[in-house]
Structures are given as structure tokens and as C-alpha cells.
Amino acid sequence: MFDIELDELRSWFGFGVAGNFAGHLEQAGESADFVNVASNGVAPKGIFPWYVPGDDGFLGQFPLSHDETVLPDSDTPLNLQIEPEVGLACRVHWLGDVVASLEPFALGAFNDCSIRRPNAPKISYKKNWGSASKGVAQQFFEVSDLTPDGPTATLRLNCHLHTSDGQEHEYGVDSPLLGYSYYGEVLLDWITERLDNQKGSADTPLEDVGALMVAAGHPAHVLIGIGATKYTPLGESTYLQAGDEAVVRVYSTASDEASELRQRVRSVR
């Protein structure tokens, strides 16, 4: 297993993949946001930033935590949902200002926790509200081979919610990593192409992530949330409350190894 150090992650760039698991965007009420985004068949809709080291705006806030989710400071109720994902750690190979390739070396449990904000101009507006907006497990699986018959073929992702009244609920549908629409080299090649060519526009929720990476100083590493799985009926309709515990787990069916993330939810005050 590979230890994930938060201090080290402060220099990494963070971004996510939208629409990489069939049905998730519809469950999250976000499919309409992508009406002006062209995509090919089952391909994801695009990529979005959630952490830009050195950025002067909200994306420059370091959002990752191993053990808690801090609710945004708001006078009105905000609907927050766990987004159970695989976090993929990659080395970035640059050719000038262009990302030539991404080299994966570890993966594990990641919570791309999101505020459901209707009509948000960009996906990133739902993703980073400051400290402990996002969750990452303390340990990842060490993997460089993402081929369908490789070492990740036996890995699955699940998600549970422990509510403050002591109940435990299945929040995300237990899914194989090979269930992602794009995975392995197909996903890495697609992401690299998007980093080079996705420019974003006013009529879509997407942004020029590649340009943000260049502005961040050509980071040597990235943490990529490769997409949230489908929700259970309870997960689709249940939002996080102070006192809850969110659990995201990437586990092996061939051994007892697991990358597990447990985050206690608390208010900022």
C-alpha cells in the first residue's frame, strides 16, 4: 500500500472526470448542465478542476482531509452529497506547456463531495468551499497497470453512510472498477486529450483545465477523481448532516486489502 501524505498533496493539482459512470449525472440532477457539451457515445462529459495550487481564487484553497467533512458556512440549507470515487495518483510528463502523458502509480478511496447548486456556472463552483471539502484515504493501492486483466480487475468501490442516530446505510452501489465507462489506458488517453484541447465556454460547465495546470507551475503530480458511481435510492435522496460519517472504500475481492476513507461530518461553527 502507498501512504498518502496531505502535506505532499498541497503541491499536487486536483481535477475530476464528469459523467464516467452511467446514470450518475441523472441521479445527481446535473445532466441538464451538459446539454451543450458534445460527447462520443459512452465517453465522459469532460474534466473539471477542484484544486489549483497557488490560485488566488477559491480553487487555491486546499480542500483535502483524511477524516472529516466540514459543511460550508451558510445561512441557508445546502444539499451536500458524498461522491464515492476512485482517486488516481499520476505523475505528469510535460512537453513544454502540453501534458504529453499521465503515469499512474497509485489509486484508492476518494470522496468528491459536492454541493448540489442548481445553475452553478461551472462544476468547480460545487466542489471546493475550503478546508475539508474533499476526502482522500490515508492509503492507496500501489498500481501502475490499469489493464482490464491486470491487478485492478479484482478491485471494487462501495460507499456507506453512518447517520448520527447510529444507523448504517448503503449510499453508493457497490461496483467493480472495470464498471467505469472509461478506464485504464482509454481513460488516461482521453484525459490527456482533454487537458490539451478542452477550452471551456460560457455556455458549458467546463473550464480550460490544462491552462490552469500551466498557470499552477506545471505540477509534477495530479490526483484525479475518475468519476462517481451510481447512488442507491437512499443515497440519491439523502444529504449530509453534522454528526454523520461518510465511508468510501476501494477493496480487493482477492485479498483483505482495502483503501478506506472515513470522514466525520461537522459544521464549521
Each predicted region: which residue ranges?
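Short, charged beta-turn/beta-strand-edge "cap" motif at the junction between a beta-strand
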Residues: 22, 228-233, 251-256
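Loop/turn positions that initiate beta-strands
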Residues: 219, 241-245
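Glycine-rich beta-strand-to-loop/alpha-helix junction loops that act as flexible
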Residues: 17-19, 218-232
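Glycine-enriched loop-and-adjacent helix/strand subsegments that border the catalytic/binding cleft
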Residues: 9-214, 237-238, 261-269
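Short, hydrophobic/aliphatic alpha-helical segments
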Residues: 1-10
